[in-house]
Regions:
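The substrate-binding groove and active-site-proximal loops of carbohydrate-active enzymes
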Residues: 1, 13, 88-112, 128-138, ...
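Aromatic-lined carbohydrate-recognition surfaces of secreted/lumenal glycan-active proteins
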Residues: 3, 11, 137-140, 144, ...
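Glycan-recognition surfaces
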Residues: 153-234, 238-240, 247, 251-254, ...
């Protein structure tokens, strides 16, 4: 299965296609740059203003120029984006006039909608199985309804949304027509806090309660490219500490589970990768090669002979967890009962550090503790 990353909210400031056919029009190529906003434009502009973001660099060493300045990807309507803004990106215009009360101009269909649909249909036509849609909540849900309907009418593509605002979950599933949403703000953040002893294990109960009715639509994970590795010094410091959390998210419900590459090897993400530096993550901004994964690839053998004993141990644990999650009927289609929720006043049960639940299918019952 192949799932690719689709970034619909923003593109690089120097974006252009180096492989398009002659009849394809690049994003922004026909924009009226004298207008701050136009439904026919692909970008937002700051007319009469030049982009300024030297960040201490000398003028003679800073060759990039942009006039008029385009609005930055994180909705920064300022010609002087800060270091914490997404200054290397420009915001795409889906027909919402942010500067004038967020009035929407969706009829006729904005030019950006058609261009982005062309991109989606191109990749769907290549036979991909799914799309992980970056910062989907920053794009109008009306676009998603329209675009996903068009794509899925032609191709069996799975759509996964990166949405961090829980109040938008239901509308992005129902109206937006997404198949799954990232469970980051709820389950991931809670499990990370439990591992780091920053919150009680009983907080996990609130996670499933918050998404009751659509729990099966939440994509659970403990690592991805944006987050710090479990084994990093910024998270738990060792891979074993993440095993109980993996068991919770893999066994608790029937929702999908995602493993980030190298997670099953205990990858720490503590390399110094150029621009990113040592941050506990793996290569957000830089091309990089990870030794733990290279050792598993082992010149195309894809075996464990190049792994350390500790890496093999972690990998085998992950294999067992995933095998149970895929084959046990009580996990794949069973009922769920939260035992921690039922034992809040039980003095023999430590709700601060323990979490327990039951799964049941026909006569099969599983206790997870």
């Amino acid at each position: 299965k192949v799932i690719i990353d689709f970034v619909p909210n923003h593109v690089s400031r120097q974006y252009h296609s180096d492989a398009k056919e002659s009849f394809i029009v690049d994003l922004g190529q026909t924009d009226n740059t004298s207008k701050a906003f136009s439904p026919g434009n692909n970008f937002y502009y700051l007319p009469g203003q030049t982009l300024q973001f030297h960040f201490g660099a000398k003028q003679e060493d800073f060759e990039y120029s942009e006039f008029p300045a385009k609005v930055t990807g994180n909705d920064c309507f300022n010609a002087n984006p800060g270091m914490n803004d997404w200054y290397e990106t420009i915001k795409l215009n889906y027909g919402v006039d942010y500067a004038n009360g967020k009035v929407s101009y969706f009829n006729p269909i904005p030019d950006t909608w058609n261009k982005m649909l062309e991109i989606l249909m191109f990749w769907a036509g290549k036979g991909i199985d799914g799309l992980r849609c970056d910062m989907a909540e920053m794009v109008p849900v009306e676009f998603w309804h329209w675009a996903i309907t068009h794509v899925t009418n032609c191709y069996p593509v799975c759509f996964i949304a990166e949405v961090y605002n829980p109040s938008l979950y239901r509308i992005f599933l129902s109206k937006g027509k997404f198949d799954y949403l990232y469970d980051k703000v709820g389950l991931y953040d809670t499990l990370k806090a439990v591992i780091r002893k920053e919150t009680s294990a009983c907080s996990i109960t609130k996670c499933w309660q918050a998404v009751e009715g659509f729990q099966d639509k939440m994509l659970a994970f403990m690592e991805n490219h944006d987050e710090q590795r479990i084994a990093s010094n910024f998270f738990a410091g060792n891979a074993r500490s993440g095993i109980p959390a993996m068991m919770v998210l893999a066994f608790m419900h029937v929702n999908p589970v995602m493993i980030y590459f190298g997670q099953e090897l205990g990858e720490s993400g503590m390399d110094e990768e150029g621009f990113s530096g040592v941050d506990g993550r793996t290569s957000i901004f830089d091309y990089w090669s990870i030794k733990s994964v290279r050792n598993w690839v082992n010149n195309g053998r894809f075996d464990e002979t190049g792994l350390t004993e500790k890496q093999c141990e972690i990998r085998n644990i992950y294999k067992k967890i995933l095998r149970i999650a895929r084959t046990e009927k009580a996990i794949t289609s069973g009922l769920f009962y939260d035992l921690s929720y039922a034992n809040t006043s039980n003095k023999c049960f430590n709700t601060g550090r323990q979490y327990a639940f039951m799964r049941k299918h026909d006569n099969e019952e599983l206790l997870d503790l």
